[in-house]
């Protein structure tokens, strides 16, 4: 008998250009909605700069400083 366990992750939502999803000048619920859209359970606008989400599926791409491509034209 097997069991499938999906590890859920947290982190900054990432745009197609590799940058963090900005929440500057957005309404308070913006990040929570964006996190919900990718099947995250909760999220908020971190320091009024970028959307941070909790409990997202492993398939969601998140921003990572080690692989950051923001502003590099990729």
UniProtKB/Swiss-Prot annotation:
Organism, as annotated:
Tityus discrepans
Tissue specificity, in the record's words, reads: Expressed by the venom gland.
Q: Name one GO cellular component term.
A: extracellular region
| Signal peptide span | 1-8
Described by its record, this protein's role is as follows: Beta toxins bind voltage-independently at site-4 of sodium channels (Nav) and shift the voltage of activation toward more negative potentials thereby affecting sodium channel activation and promoting spontaneous and repetitive firing.
Q: What is the protein name stated in its UniProt record?
A: Toxin Td6
Domain of life from the UniProt record: Eukaryota
| Modified residues annotated as Arginine amide in this record | 72
Report the SUPFAM superfamilies cross-referenced here: Scorpion toxin-like
